[in-house]
């Protein structure tokens, strides 16, 4: 099957963004393209139409290719639950959790068979696969059990490009060192080097490129300028870098997102960040909450542990005081569960078994169970505006029920036409929802922001705006156009 492989000298070299751009470039040239990443470790996930989980980056790459996401595009997804354990998702379904030391003993053979099956299936449906590696292909201590890099390239006999981040320094050493550590048959697959994240005058780089090509015998096929991250990365640590590079001037609204230790699906906030009148700030639980226009508690892979940290740090109490004074609070997925009265984990699914007090801002009680819900949803809104179509997806293991005893039924309302997907209090101050992708829905997002604007005495913005996916299409086209002007794909398509 025809394929291209993209590997990097290090993590964060820009493999995902480059793979995304190549998918759109080739799609525009008439190829039927599919992305592929054999194994991904990420807490940003997407639910396919079949109800399977894949890395969100592979969903974006599929959209860039102009196709719907399939579980075969990311057959193995590892979702960290702690520093030493991960939940294992194979072909979209959770098969358990495992320690890092036991993972390869238990799943290596199954993992490779799954990767082979997925590649064969994709190969029958698409003209070309654009495959992304992970980390570095030259991690000596991990190479014998690497499922994602050169093992895939060799299986496909895929011409491979090596991407290096020049912005962090040491690019030439990274390229030469990586090539030196590859086996001869692996090195033979490297058909080009891409220098990524370049700032400055290109002519100053030319002597280095000439030396590198003479030293390695491999051409530099592209020098990509430094491009602002246009989509959320897979690593929550990059939220700090992303925020520090934000160039927004004074905005009308300031929204604080609590940066939980195991924050999941912070892709939920890309549409908010796209609003020119909104500033999104990610706050550590140890930071001062301040006086934002709204506070959002996001999803998390470890709801109870992150809830306990909020309580220990004082952030939970700060949010409770903020809500009591009329501030707007929104919880999404695990954040929604935290807003309730109780979270119970009788089987110790997340770790320590027990019952834990929530923030008591919404009348729900949640039980963590072993059976995960993962599905796409299409609903109609009741608030902040009646009848708006809302699309999104659920990924959660908790089951929440409304507490009836001692609760005024007029004190809360169903957020959507399915009450199980979220609540809002009678003051429309505290909001909670299980739906990821909520802000992707342009009219709903604007209606919610307009409530905040009204509280500030600001004029409402038009709600007749497109959904974020249309803006995402424009971003993907711009990304592809920029990358295509700096990248020669000829050696990979001949």
From Swiss-Prot:
> Pathway it acts in?
Cofactor biosynthesis; adenosylcobalamin biosynthesis
The protein's GO terms of the molecular function aspect are:
ABC-type vitamin B12 transporter activity; catalytic activity
Q: Which residues form the GATase cobBQ-type domain?
A: 252-444
Keywords, sorted A to Z: Cobalamin biosynthesis, Glutamine amidotransferase
Query: Which is a Pfam family this sequence falls into?
Result: GATase_3
> Which Gene3D superfamilies does the annotation name?
3.40.50.880, P-loop containing nucleotide triphosphate hydrolases
User: According to its UniProt record, which protein family does this protein belong to?
Assistant: Belongs to the CobB/CobQ family. CobQ subfamily.
Task: Describe the task this protein carries out.
Answer: Catalyzes amidations at positions B, D, E, and G on adenosylcobyrinic A,C-diamide. NH(2) groups are provided by glutamine, and one molecule of ATP is hydrogenolyzed for each amidation.
Q: Could you tell me what this protein is called?
A: Cobyric acid synthase
What species was this sequence derived from? Answer: Nostoc punctiforme (strain ATCC 29133 / PCC 73102)
Gene field: cobQ
């Amino acid at each position: 099957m025809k394929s291209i492989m993209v590997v990097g000298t290090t993590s964060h070299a820009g493999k995902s963004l480059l793979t995304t751009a190549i998918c759109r470039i080739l799609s525009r040239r008439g190829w039927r393209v599919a992305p592929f990443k054999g194994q991904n470790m990420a807490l940003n996930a997407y639910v396919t139409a079949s109800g399977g989980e894949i890395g969100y980056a592979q969903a974006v790459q599929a959209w860039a290719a102009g196709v719907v996401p399939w579980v075969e595009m990311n057959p193995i997804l590892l979702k960290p639950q702690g520093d030493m354990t991960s939940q294992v998702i194979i072909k979209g379904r959770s098969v358990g959790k495992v320690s890092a030391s036991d993972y390869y003993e238990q799943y290596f053979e199954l993992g490779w068979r799954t990767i082979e099956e997925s590649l064969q299936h994709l190969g029958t449906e698409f003209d070309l696969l654009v495959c992304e590696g992970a980390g570095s292909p030259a991690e000596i201590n991990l190479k014998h059990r690497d499922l994602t890099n050169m093992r895939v390239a060799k299986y496909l006999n895929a011409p491979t490009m090596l991407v290096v981040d020049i912005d962090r320094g040491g690019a030439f050493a990274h390229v030469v060192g990586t090539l030196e550590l590859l086996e001869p048959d692996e090195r033979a697959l490297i058909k080009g080097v891409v220098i990524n994240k370049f700032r400055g005058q290109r002519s100053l780089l030319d002597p280095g490129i000439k030396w590198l090509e003479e030293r390695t015998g491999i051409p530099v096929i592209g020098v990509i300028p430094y491009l602002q991250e246009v989509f959320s990365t897979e690593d929550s640590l990059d939220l700090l870098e992303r925020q520090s590079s934000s160039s927004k001037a004074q905005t009308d609204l300031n929204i604080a997102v609590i940066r939980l230790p195991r924050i999941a699906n912070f892709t939920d906030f890309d549409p908010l960040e796209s609003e020119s009148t909104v500033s999104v700030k990610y706050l550590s639980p140890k930071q001062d909450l301040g006086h934002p226009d709204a506070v959002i508690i996001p999803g998390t892979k470890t709801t109870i542990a992150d809830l306990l940290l909020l309580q220990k740090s004082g952030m939970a109490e700060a949010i409770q005081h903020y809500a009591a004074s009329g501030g707007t609070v929104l919880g999404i997925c695990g954040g929604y569960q935290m807003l309730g009265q109780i979270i119970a984990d009788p089987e110790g699914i997340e770790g320590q078994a027990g019952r834990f007090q929530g923030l008591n801002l919404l009348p729900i009680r949640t039980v963590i169970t072993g059976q995960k819900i993962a599905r796409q949803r299409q609903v109609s809104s009741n608030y902040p505006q009646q009848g708006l179509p809302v699309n999104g997806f659920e990924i959660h293991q908790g089951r929440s029920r409304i507490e009836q005893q001692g609760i005024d039924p007029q004190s809360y309302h169903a957020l959507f036409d399915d009450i199980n997907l979220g609540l809002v209090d009678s003051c429309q101050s505290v909001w909670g929802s299980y739906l990821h992708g909520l802000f992707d829905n342009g009219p709903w997002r604007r209606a919610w922001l307009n409530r905040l604007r009204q509280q500030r005495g600001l004029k409402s913005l038009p709600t007749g705006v497109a959904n974020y996916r249309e803006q995402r299409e424009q971003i993907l086209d711009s990304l592809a156009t920029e990358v295509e002007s700096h990248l020669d794909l000829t050696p990979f398509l001949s």
